[in-house]
A protein has these predicted regions:
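Basic amphipathic alpha-helical segments that dock to polyanions
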Residues: 53-55, 59-60
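N-terminal helix-turn-helix DNA-binding core of bacterial DNA-binding proteins
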Residues: 12-52
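Amphipathic alpha-helical dimerization/coiled-coil segments
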Residues: 89-113
């Protein structure tokens, strides 16, 4: 049986996974490469690792939510991502859903903290 800390850690990971797409889409109005996006998210308290972010970026690019281009800076090629028109529309809808969920959760939780 898992102890309480392990259970909480697992549940926190599940919650974070569910919000990561929206978190990424909110940061993509300007071109970003993977590492700069990790830093931006971490600065806002969304802790994400490379092995989580890069597959997510590829997946949501394949869905048409992001566009990417390769650019060479110095000697290193970097893949830069930017939100697509579809991504902007999806982000807007996800934000609406987030706000509804936030309101519902606030009602459910009430003063419990």
């Amino acid at each position: 049986m898992l102890d309480m800390e392990a259970i909480i850690q697992n549940l926190q990971q599940e919650m974070n996974r569910g919000t990561l797409v929206l978190a990424v889409l909110t940061q993509m109005d300007q071109q970003q490469y993977g590492y700069s996006l990790i830093q931006a998210l971490n600065d806002e308290g969304i802790m994400v690792e490379q092995n989580t972010l890069y597959p997510l970026l590829r997946r949501i690019e394949k869905q048409g939510l992001l566009e990417s281009i390769w650019q060479v800076e110095g000697n290193r090629p970097r893949r830069y991502y930017k939100i697509s028109e579809l991504g902007i529309k999806v982000r807007k809808e996800l934000i609406k859903e987030w706000k509804l969920l936030e309101k519902s959760m606030a009602n459910l939780i009430g003063g419990e903290v």
